C-alpha cells in the first residue's frame, strides 16, 4: 500500500530495521526497467502525470536501445498489505543495474550495496546467460534471492515450466516463484511485500566512524559529479568534510540526500541508507565506483573491500573523417570521460588516417555505445579501426612490451606472446550444441564443461581468446542458433599463443591502419581476404600497384591493381611498325619512371569499408 509522504521516515533518522536494500537482476529485455516503473507508480513517488515508460533510463541511447547503462537508485516508501509488518511504513531502496556483460563491474558494486536481489526472468524465454552470470555474482555477495517470473500476460508465457527451472537453479520450491506482469501491474504489490518479508535489514554500527561505499557516479553539467553511495557504518552529514580512502582526496559535502527518483536534499543519511552526495568535484575519476568514503575527523581506518580499477579489455582507434574535427573529438572524449570512468584514451597518429585517439573500452557494447554517443551527442563523423585486445610480448633479450595497437607489435626475436582469455558461457536450446561447438572450436576455444538446465536447454562453458570474440563472434553465434543463444563472458587471465602481425603493403609501403595481430594458422586466410578486398576498392593508377600481405619480411599473399592503359597508337593509321614500337617503348619508359616515384592514395571510402565491416575478422561474414 503506498505510504503517504507525511509518515515516511527522514533519511537521517530512519531505523535500519525498516530499510530494505535490493536490486533487480535480469537479462536484457526481460522487463527490468518496466518493473521499476510499476514500483514507482505503486509506491506513489512519481506523480501519474509525470510518469513515462522506462522512467529511470535517462540517456537517449538507453531509451532507444532498451538497455540500462548506468545504475540508478530510488528510495521507495512501502507499507506491506499483509504479514506481521502490515501497515508499517518501510523504506525500500531499489538499485536498477545494467544487464550487459560489459558493465559487470558496475553490477557487482551495485550488488555489494544491497542485501537482497529480485531475480527477474521472462516467462516466455526462460533463463539466459546474463541472468546466470549476475545470479552467480549475487550468490558470491551472499544476497537473499527473490525469484520472479515476469511477462505472464504474454500468450507465449510458460510460467509452470520456467518456475521449475528457476526453482532448480536457486534451490527453492516452484510455488515460491512469484509471477508478475510488469506491464499490467499484476502481482507487483505481492512482490514488494515479499521484499519486505524476505530481504534482511542492513546491519551497521550507528555510532562507528562513517563508512560509505560508492556504487555509481554521474556527471551533472550544473552541479559537477553526483556520487551515489550506500552508508555501511555511522552517518554522513551536510557540510561535513569527507575523505576518499583510495586516493586520500578530501572534499566538503555541499549537498546530501536521497533520490526518489528526483534528487531530494536531506540533513544527512544514516546506516543502511542509499543516497547521493555532491561535493562540487568536476571529474568522475575522483569518485571511483567501489571506493570508500569516510569523515575527515575521526574517520575510519579500514576501507570496505572489493574496490578495483576497471581495466579496458578492447582497444580501437577513433579518427575523425575530417582532420579539422580533431580538437572537437578530444573535447568530446574529455566530456564522456567525466561520466564514464572506465573509458581511457591517448592520442595517436596514423600515416593513413591522420590524427586520432586509441581508446580503451570494457567490451564491445561499451565501444558501440561510446561511438554512438560521440556521433550523436557531439555530431562527429568517425572512422573506428578494427577492435583489438592487449598483448604482452616477451622478447628473447628479456624485455617486455605491452601492445595496444597492432602497428606497435615489435619486430625481431620474439620469445612469447601472451593474449587475454575469457571464460564464455553460452545458453541455448540443446539442438544447437553441434553448431555452437563447431563455432567455438573454430575460434581456438577449449571446452570446459556442459550442463543441461532442463531437457531442452543447455549451458556450454568454453575458454576462448578474447581476440576471437571481439569481432563478430556474437553475430555468428546468433545466426547459427537462429537468435536463441545468449552469451556471457568474464576475463580469466591470459595464455601464450602463436601470434603474428600481418602487415598490408601498398606498392611496397606499409599501411599502418590495416595491420592486424592474428593467430599463425589464420594469418594466410586473413591476408588473402584483405588483399582481395583492397584490390576491388583501390582505384586503378597509371602504373600497376602490387598489394601484398606480409608477416615480417615474408609475403604471404598478393594481388595487383592493373594499370590503366592509354592507347598511344590511336593516332597511327597503318604506317611503319618501328614508329609504333617507338611510341610503345616511350610509354613503357614513362610507366617505369612513374612506378619509381608514384604514390598510391587510398581513398577514404576504402578505409571505411575495410574497417567498418568486420569481414576482415570472421570467415562467415564474407560468405553472406
UniProtKB/Swiss-Prot annotation:
Example of a GO biological process term: positive regulation of translation
Subcellular location as annotated: Cell membrane
SMART domains, sorted: EFG_C
Keyword match Membrane: yes
Binding-site residues for GTP, renumbered to this chain: 29-34, 150-153
This protein's UniProt keywords: Cell membrane, GTP-binding, Hydrolase, Membrane, Nucleotide-binding, Protein biosynthesis
Gene3D superfamilies, alphabetized: 3.30.70.240, Elongation factor 4, C-terminal domain, Elongation Factor G (Translational Gtpase), domain 3, P-loop containing nucleotide triphosphate hydrolases, Translation factors
Record's function text: Required for accurate and efficient protein synthesis under certain stress conditions. May act as a fidelity factor of the translation reaction, by catalyzing a one-codon backward translocation of tRNAs on improperly translocated ribosomes. Back-translocation proceeds from a post-translocation (POST) complex to a pre-translocation (PRE) complex, thus giving elongation factor G a second chance to translocate the tRNAs correctly. Binds to ribosomes in a GTP-dependent manner.
Name under which the protein is recorded: Elongation factor 4
